[in-house]
Design a protein with these regions (language model features):
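Buried, small/hydrophobic-residue-enriched core segments of structured protein domains
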Residues: 1-39, 90-99, 108-327, 347-349
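Short, surface-exposed acidic
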Residues: 223-225, 333, 364-365
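Anionic-ligand-binding alpha/beta catalytic cores of soluble enzymes and soluble regulatory domains
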Residues: 338-366
Length: 366
């Protein structure tokens, strides 16, 4: 089988439509919109250029692809179904280039729902069947557009709570971090969704997304950044009795900068109480690390109910390391530490956490 055979990148039923259109049809003009009734009133359009460059650009129709598609469709649906004549015409008359024109809003643009995001039309009257043949492929733009929209809305949410709690906004670009690689359906999905996230935030662990701007958008800038961090396999490598020893090992071997540590391998409360207890070896190790210029430690609870656990962790950290008030009266940690939730969140849960923090007197910047 030929990889990415354009003749086959469609729905089965669309292969039959070339003989269903009225005789004399010469032009098909199709458009994509985000339907009214969506969760948000604007859609961030993103991902089209990738689809064009990956699947539609260049001499993509070949004799081998036509022959393969003809044989497959004959067995899949029936003989004389595949539009061999139409594809052969594109190969012979257009040298394998698709005779279509695609127009779209600039990628990254927020567009009110109910408005056209892109249009597709044929540029050769004999290829009237082609625009809608490409619908299944082009509509894959829904996924990166959805992720881009969601990240943009979360950024608005974070910005709002930073403002109302009197927080500095130095960390806004990193308040929503992408750990989505393992949750994506494929590496391609991770690349698309991960780069969509980077339209609004700079924090990501999805390395697959980092090359997207240069490879498909002629932009060599790096837009995603991460930090050194642990996972449960690291923190539990010496067992429950060796937890503190392993934490000390992690801190001792960490490079300068931000260090993120998962704290719920056994009991997050025990972890934070020991970390904040003056005079303990762990407390001294943390304070020594924080003495380094621009060093920061982020504590990451990954289990339990996110809202209540977040407030509990904030209070425990404040008891151990101290806090002060913003100009609007909300608590901020005295030291360069922070809290990160790494699992099971959606827009509503993020909103709940930020609202609960404000209600409990905590600034969003923590």
């Amino acid at each position: 089988m030929i990889e990415n055979n354009i003749c086959l990148l469609t729905d089965s039923y669309k292969v039959t439509h070339h003989y269903f259109y009225p005789k004399g049809t010469e032009k098909i003009y199709s458009y994509l919109e985000s339907r009214v009734g969506a969760e948000f009133n604007k859609t961030i359009f993103y991902g089209l250029q990738y689809l064009i460059k990956k699947y539609l650009e260049g001499r993509i129709v070949t004799q081998e692809k036509i022959d393969e598609a003809d044989n497959l469709i004959a067995n899949h649906i029936g003989p004389d179904i595949f539009n061999r004549e139409g594809w052969q015409y594109i190969l012979d008359e257009h040298d394998g280039y698709l005779p279509i024109e695609i127009k779209a809003v600039a990628e990254g643009t927020p567009v009110d729902v109910g408005n056209a995001l892109m249009t597709v039309e044929n540029t050769d009257d004999k290829s009237y069947w082609l625009p809608n043949y490409l619908e299944p492929l082009l509509l894959q733009v829904w996924y990166p557009s959805t992720v881009a929209t969601l990240s943009a809305e979360v950024r608005k949410l974070c910005n709002f709570y930073l403002e109302v709690t009197g927080s500095v906004k130095d960390n806004l670009d990193f308040m929503l971090h992408d750990f989505g690689y393992r949750g994506a359906t494929s590496t391609e999905s991770a690349m698309l969704s991960g780069s969509a996230h980077l339209l609004s935030f700079s924090g990501t662990d999805t390395i697959a997304a980092l090359t997207m701007p240069e490879n498909y958008y002629n932009d060599s800038n790096l837009y995603g950044f991460s930090v050194q961090a642990t996972e449960h396999s690291v923190m539990t490598s010496l067992g429950p009795e060796g937890e503190i020893s392993q934490i000390l090992n992690v801190i001792d071997n960490a490079k300068d900068g931000v260090l993120s540590m998962v704290i719920d391998s056994y009991n997050y409360r025990n972890f934070l109480e020991e970390a904040g207890k003056s005079g303990t070896e762990l407390n001294e190790a943390i304070l020594n690390f924080l003495d380094g210029e621009d060093n920061k430690i982020v504590f990451r609870p990954d289990s339990g109910e996110p809202v209540s656990t977040t407030i509990d962790c904030l209070n425990l950290l404040s008891e151990g390391f101290g806090s002060h008030l913003t100009d609007k009266g909300y608590k901020v940690f005295d030291l360069n530490i922070g809290l990160l939730w790494g699992d099971g969140l959606n827009y509503q849960k993020i909103r709940d956490i930020l609202f609960a923090m404000k209600s409990a007197g905590w600034a969003a910047q923590n």
